[in-house]
């Protein structure tokens, strides 16, 4: 049996892990670290919550991801991004969501994490001081891809779900994605998968796309090696596959000289959104590669205005 003193110590440790840490910088906000938004394989899925002093009632999920790897080591760098600071300055509560990472998790498992975060945030909206029906999402590179998959493939509310938290919708109301992958079957050029593209550039990304299927014959998960089956995975996990007219408004920001995630990915996605009647824009970063430093002229305004327009109803 755990003693009273041991219990008190455990509670103190748990509270310390999620305590609000005042930020000494220019933007006035508090940071709550290591909030558990869900579980996977017995492990907690974590996020940090950044609450500005003057909240505007809306929230933006920042998908912490690069190369389908997510770690809190990236958060200090992310908090220095002008776009991140701008969200806080404008009163948005920012949820820095970390997902399961490759090589431990492959993409089919990774995409299941973001909806859990949305449901947790929406279910606890009052606790976070926001309106649960005014949620946006943003991310860069693989974070942008996961943000778009969430925007297009997330499910609505299921009133018959066993758990109350699963009865709320995992859909968001707006998305902004920086240089995202969108079509993993035709990545840069037709009939070239995302993995083939990465391999052609000497990039090691196999673990992300190491797909497996359950085999009743062997009673274990077997690696998918058949080309047609692999293409089905790529297709089903591509954001472009799931575009429908009821998707949230999407802004894509992409560099024309991006060799890692070709500019074509942003173009084809925005074209299909337009065809489906989904409000969308493509901010063209002329001459820019896969990421850049100082924001371009009009970039930060486009980023903030998108969320203001669709989450705050500002014209």
Task: List the predicted regions and their residue ranges.
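N-terminal cap/lid segment of alpha/beta-hydrolase-fold proteins
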Residues: 25-55, 106
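Mobile cap/lid helix-loop segments that gate and shape the active-site cleft of serine hydrolases
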Residues: 29, 40, 73, 151, ...
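Primarily recognizes the serine-hydrolase "nucleophile elbow" in alpha/beta-hydrolase
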Residues: 69, 119-194
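Short amphipathic alpha-helix adjacent to the substrate-entry channel of hydrolases
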Residues: 74-95
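Alpha/beta-hydrolase active-site loop
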Residues: 105-126, 301
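Short beta-strand/loop motif that positions the catalytic acidic residue
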Residues: 246, 252-254, 258
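Catalytic histidine-centered segment of alpha/beta-hydrolase-like enzymes
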Residues: 288-297
